[in-house]
Amino acid sequence: MCGAYIIAFTTNDLPWLIFPGMALVAFGGISLIMTNVQLSNMFPVGGGAVVGIISGAFDSSSGIQLMVKLGYEQGISRKTSYLILASTHVLTFVSTFLFLPKDYVHPVQEEYVVTQEIELEIPEKPGLDSGKTEKKVTSKTTSDNEVNLSSLVRLIRTPTYLLHVMWVCLLQLRLFYILGSINRILEKELENKKEVSDYTNVMLYVLMGGIVASPLAGAFLELNISLFKNSKSSFSRSVKPNIMSLTLTSALGVVLSVLLLLEDPSHLYYIFVFLVLYRSIFYTMVNAYIVLAFPSAFIGSLIGITTVTSGVFCLLQHALFEWSARRNAKEVNIFLIVLIGISCIHPFWQWIACRRAEQRESTKE
């Protein structure tokens, strides 16, 4: 709300207000999604779809800026639009104080354990079959209301988490670069400013499709959860359903990069469609993976650490913009294809870890 008010009062005489305004809007948005995504734990079945719906609503927020742009073209000032937007933020207070749970959304009886070799023993989610522990337990059992720093550090140091942070950083850099350079791409490939404005509107309309694409991504994740719910290993039941979606997201990033290499105006619509698919599945998996693979008591902390780390990493986009301006945008896109290829290590590693966990369970039997 404060960010929207500050942007509303930004003028040519006070241009610097845009920076604290946008920073506050970004901070508020991230805080909201970090909180609301944990609601998926309230649903024994369909948690992945819930994450998809919430991510879709977050993803389609670009439509708000489209409304501001269209309103400005019709004579509605930016100040008026942002004052109206700020007033609608009162609804978040209603949701926070009347509807959201006041504590962790998981029952406090749920327990997790930290192991020595596979440092995280995934807790059983409601609705899933109970499973055996992967290794001998080396730390005390802890309930959700006894969160401690040492356990959080152990979770952060696991390949299950570190590789996900790497995956998020690399794919988000790809996303931020295209969003930051799309206007330059349109100006280069189109003939006049009116066409650039028209295609910008089309892109924003297409991006609003995230509210449909993200729930579909969540439904696809739910399908994978049902396929692997009878896995012998509890680790596999929590991690394996994510592998297909993680791989699909990386593949979409490669396709998007190849389309950008072609530099053909006739491909712009394809770029917009693949962009909304890529962004929707990406943001769904950023959150859904952590929700499924880690204890609910740590979800907020882990999503927050992931968000901050990837945000700092994505400052590299400015170096990519400079590289593109001084040399060639094709070189940057080829470089990003290589980075996306590296991101495939994440689903591949998790697949190997799941196979090993299942083999150990088979050996015990």
Residue ranges and their predicted role:
Residues 231-286:
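C-terminal transmembrane helical hairpin of 12-TM major facilitator-type secondary transporters
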Residues 152-217, 283, 287:
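Extracytoplasmic gate region of multi-pass secondary transporters
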